[in-house]
């Protein structure tokens, strides 16, 4: 099993933590990670695009001229698609672009991205992130002490509200829990900052 250094909030190395190789030490499957990232990005699309078809365009209830005898082509409504100002045929309608992948695929993708971060030495383990109250400055000091100055995903245990609130106003900092950390979040982050308790939760969920 791989060992990573365990730091406290002041940036001091206090111990090491053992990581489960079945989760943090596998050969990353780039193809699966790609599929999951595409799926998650698709789910983020709003899909609120819409056009008006002939029934939605205002007006056009009266037949523009009689059926026969004018010499012109027969018409039933000035909102038919062939008219300027008419309805659109087969235009985009509101829809969801999201789709689900099998659970095994999603779990393998998570293991792959966690393993990649550990292999690239971009995984920082911290003993705990505990704050007496939500303080952005205190959280910024923790990141500074740990020499984290790039885009970081902080994974904390469930219920650590003060950590979430403290980091909310910091640029390039995203806070998640083991349950909400997505493959897309992990891929987008330059570094992972994970509490010891969160590591245990990740291993429990993905084991």
Swiss-Prot record:
The gene is rplD. Keywords: Ribonucleoprotein, Ribosomal protein, RNA-binding, rRNA-binding. One of its GO terms (biological process) is translation. GO terms for molecular function: rRNA binding; structural constituent of ribosome. Belongs to the universal ribosomal protein uL4 family. InterPro entries: Ribosomal_uL4, Ribosomal_uL4-like, Ribosomal_uL4_dom_sf. Part of the 50S ribosomal subunit. SUPFAM superfamilies: Ribosomal protein L4. The keyword rRNA-binding applies. Gene3D superfamilies: 3.40.1370.10. PANTHER family: 50S RIBOSOMAL PROTEIN L4, LARGE RIBOSOMAL SUBUNIT PROTEIN UL4M. HAMAP family: Ribosomal_uL4_B (MF_01328_B). One of its GO terms (cellular component) is ribonucleoprotein complex. This is Large ribosomal subunit protein uL4. One of the primary rRNA binding proteins, this protein initially binds near the 5'-end of the 23S rRNA. It is important during the early stages of 50S assembly. It makes multiple contacts with different domains of the 23S rRNA in the assembled 50S subunit and ribosome. Residues 49-78 are annotated as: Disordered. It holds the Pfam family Ribosomal_L4.
């Amino acid at each position: 099993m791989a060992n990573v250094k365990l730091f406290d909030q002041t940036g001091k190395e206090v111990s090491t933590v053992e990581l489960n190789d079945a989760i943090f030490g596998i050969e990353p499957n780039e193809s699966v990670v790609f599929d999951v990232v595409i799926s998650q990005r698709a789910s983020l699309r709003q899909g609120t695009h819409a056009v008006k078809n002939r029934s939605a365009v205002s007006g056009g209830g009266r037949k523009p001229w009689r059926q026969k005898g004018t010499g012109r082509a027969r018409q039933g409504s000035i909102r038919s698609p062939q008219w300027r100002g008419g309805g659109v045929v087969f235009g985009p309608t509101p829809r969801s672009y999201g789709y689900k992948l099998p659970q095994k695929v999603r779990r393998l993708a998570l293991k792959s991205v966690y393993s990649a971060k550990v292999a690239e030495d971009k995984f920082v383990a911290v003993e705990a992130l505990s704050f007496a109250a939500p303080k952005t400055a205190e959280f910024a000091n923790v990141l500074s002490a740990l020499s984290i100055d790039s885009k970081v995903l902080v994974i904390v245990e469930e219920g650590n509200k003060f950590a979430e609130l403290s980091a909310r106003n910091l640029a390039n900092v995203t806070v998640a829990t083991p349950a909400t950390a997505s493959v897309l979040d992990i891929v987008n982050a330059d570094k992972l900052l994970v509490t010891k308790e969160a590591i245990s939760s990740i291993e429990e969920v993905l084991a």
